[in-house]
């Protein structure tokens, strides 16, 4: 859904204003035009009460949010923004497939190289009262087909971990039967895999943009022209504008050192490049899914900060490159705004014209992104 002009102006005012009191005034006056408007602003100064919500990395294992949650302020058009109110805030950690694999191996009493550090990580999550989620692993599981019996072991390992009060190696590998409600929950998780099929369009879109950027990076033209070609492909071939991904690819095409580690998998030509492009697309989708969960929670009247649990350094780097500044919704319009966008770094009339033309499009038809990815994959294969 393209953001409407009035919505865009409202969000831009919030984005560019630096005075917290003026931000409150802007929200209170402009949000009256909506039936329901909730936004979280992540740049209004550190709140000492939100110290427990800070990002952490423990011996390489992360609890990373998509912004600095300790600097957040929750806006709701049903309340005066300057008045004190009590808010219940939850925190959920989304464990990636690698972390779940380590957990499954410990439960199955298999050797784990970094065993004690990992158990300490699991203990910290439990003691700090994070809710557990494996949505991003469900997503990964679809991309890397796993036998149903093996996948059931993953799910039961997570459910067992959630059930335990005391986390030790012995308690994790103990064969104790779980309470019946926990088995019901495990079945619900297994059944929810079907919902994740809907996310495949998002995967193919991101994979297409990464593939096109990789192709352009191998060509002899200046970085600005490469980015213009990528933007044109995104807007006119894929019929979509993804600011986060385009910002990342702008850095990638300009050989920016800040993204070198994050995109190490797609920095050079290799026989594994298509697989590496897919893996990087999944990394980016982890972030997208976490953001979507936060918005869905807000729509239900809940404020829940979501984190990614991973040991993947590339994913950790991507999460930190361009954190959220504002997230939420204005009626049915989702709002996701980050600290930076590529328009701050590359001023060009051609870009402005391309974006304006895209915004004013009326006849946006359906695009088969799977076919688009298959097509561009053949172009990537020719380079190898």
Question: Where are the language model's segments positioned?
Answer:
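Active-site-proximal, substrate-binding regions of enzyme catalytic domains
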Residues: 2-306, 319-326, 330, 334-384
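Acidic beta-strand-to-loop metal/phosphate-binding motif
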Residues: 308-310
């Amino acid at each position: 859904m393209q953001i409407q002009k009035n919505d865009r102006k409202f969000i831009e005012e919030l984005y560019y204003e630096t005075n917290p009191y003026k931000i409150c005034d802007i929200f209170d006056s402009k949000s009256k035009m909506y039936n329901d408007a909730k936004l979280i602003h992540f740049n209004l100064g550190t709140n000492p009460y939100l110290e427990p919500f800070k990002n952490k990395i423990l011996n390489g294992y992360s609890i990373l949010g998509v912004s600095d949650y300790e600097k957040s302020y929750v806006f709701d058009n049903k309340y005066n923004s300057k008045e004190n109110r009590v808010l219940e805030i939850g925190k959920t950690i989304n464990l990636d497939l690698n972390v779940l694999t380590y957990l499954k191996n410990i439960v199955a009493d298999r050797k784990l190289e970094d065993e004690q550090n990992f158990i300490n990580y699991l203990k910290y999550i439990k003691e700090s009262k994070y809710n557990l989620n494996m949505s991003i692993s469900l997503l990964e599981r679809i991309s890397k087909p796993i036998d149903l019996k093996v996948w059931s072991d993953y799910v039961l390992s997570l459910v067992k971990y959630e059930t335990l009060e005391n986390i030790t190696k012995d308690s994790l590998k103990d064969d104790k039967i779980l309470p019946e409600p926990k088995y019901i929950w495990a079945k619900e998780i297994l059944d929810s895999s079907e919902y994740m099929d809907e996310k495949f369009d998002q995967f193919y879109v991101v994979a297409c943009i990464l593939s096109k950027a990789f192709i352009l990076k191998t060509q002899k033209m200046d970085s600005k022209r490469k980015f213009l070609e990528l933007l044109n492909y995104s807007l006119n071939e894929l019929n979509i504008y993804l600011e986060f991904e385009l910002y990342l690819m702008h850095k990638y095409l300009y050989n920016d050192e800040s993204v070198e580690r994050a995109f190490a998998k797609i920095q050079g030509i290799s026989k594994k490049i298509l697989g590496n492009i897919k893996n990087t697309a999944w990394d980016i989708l982890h972030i997208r899914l976490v953001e979507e969960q936060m918005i869905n929670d807000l729509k239900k009247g809940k404020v829940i900060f979501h984190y990614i649990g991973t040991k993947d350094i590339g994913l950790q780097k991507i999460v930190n490159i361009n954190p959220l500044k504002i997230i939420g919704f204005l009626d049915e319009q989702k709002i996701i705004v980050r600290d930076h966008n590529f328009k701050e770094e590359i001023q060009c009339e051609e870009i402005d014209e391309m974006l304006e033309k895209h915004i004013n499009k009326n006849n946006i038809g359906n695009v088969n992104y799977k076919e688009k990815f298959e097509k561009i994959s053949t172009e990537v294969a020719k380079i190898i």
